[in-house]
Amino acid sequence: MNLRLELTRFLKLCFVLSSAFMFWKGLSIATNSHSPIVVVLSGSMEPAFQRGDVLFLWNRNERSKVGDVVIYEVQDKSIPIVHRVLREHHNDKNKQLLLTKGDNNAGDDIPLYGRKKIYLQKERDIVGTVKGYVPQLGYVTIWISENKYAKLALMGFLGISALLSNE
């Protein structure tokens, strides 16, 4: 075992991981969104977006307009929801309030909001507005997250390739 070679491998791995982290944080700052890239997980927005599409978000708009596709998070639920703005209002403090609906859903999203909420607050609940997408690229992440053997195989492959790398 060559200590110098092992330390070099470890430092390269740290460099790759920290570079990926810094890229993600830089993208988050540029888009003003803690999650600037998301994968569509359901068919509620068909035909506009299919399950597995990768969406690119932007959250620097002061206001959302009726017809915008936004991603929002509901308290106590970790999965972001991709739906279209159906109505837009303002409260007494001039805060924008939004009502959303999936294109492929029969009704609006009020039942999803929870806790007697009838609107989303733009500043608090909206993660971002969709500005672009890549069709079906996200199926890989869906497959890995839904298949425990795929997760283990990927982790094993990455671990073995890191150990066997000579550069």
Swiss-Prot record:
GO terms for molecular function: serine-type endopeptidase activity. It is found in: Endoplasmic reticulum membrane. Catalytic component of the signal peptidase complex (SPC) which catalyzes the cleavage of N-terminal signal sequences from nascent proteins as they are translocated into the lumen of the endoplasmic reticulum. Specifically cleaves N-terminal signal peptides that contain a hydrophobic alpha-helix (h-region) shorter than 18-20 amino acids. PANTHER family: SIGNAL PEPTIDASE COMPLEX CATALYTIC SUBUNIT SEC11. InterPro entries: LexA/Signal_pep-like_sf, Pept_S26A_signal_pept_1_Ser-AS, Peptidase_S24_S26A/B/C, Peptidase_S26, Peptidase_S26B. It is a single-pass type II membrane protein. Signal peptide: none annotated. The lineage of its organism: Eukaryota, Fungi, Dikarya, Ascomycota, Saccharomycotina. Residues 1-12 are cytoplasmic. Residues 153-164 are annotated as: C-terminal short (CTS) helix. Keywords: Endoplasmic reticulum, Hydrolase, Membrane, Protease, Signal-anchor, Transmembrane, Transmembrane helix. SUPFAM superfamilies: LexA/Signal peptidase. Component of the signal peptidase complex (SPC) composed of a catalytic subunit SEC11 and three accessory subunits SPC1, SPC2 and SPC3. The complex induces a local thinning of the ER membrane which is used to measure the length of the signal peptide (SP) h-region of protein substrates. This ensures the selectivity of the complex towards h-regions shorter than 18-20 amino acids. SPC associates with the translocon complex. It catalyses: Cleavage of hydrophobic, N-terminal signal or leader sequences from secreted and periplasmic proteins. Its main location: endoplasmic reticulum. The C-terminal short (CTS) helix is essential for catalytic activity. It may be accommodated as a transmembrane helix in the thinned membrane environment of the complex, similarly to the signal peptide in the complex substrates. Residues 31-167 are lumenal. GO terms for cellular component: signal peptidase complex. Belongs to the peptidase S26B family. Disulfide bonds: none annotated. This is Signal peptidase complex catalytic subunit SEC11. The active site is at S44 (charge relay system), H83 (charge relay system), D109 (charge relay system). It is an enzyme of class 3 (hydrolase).
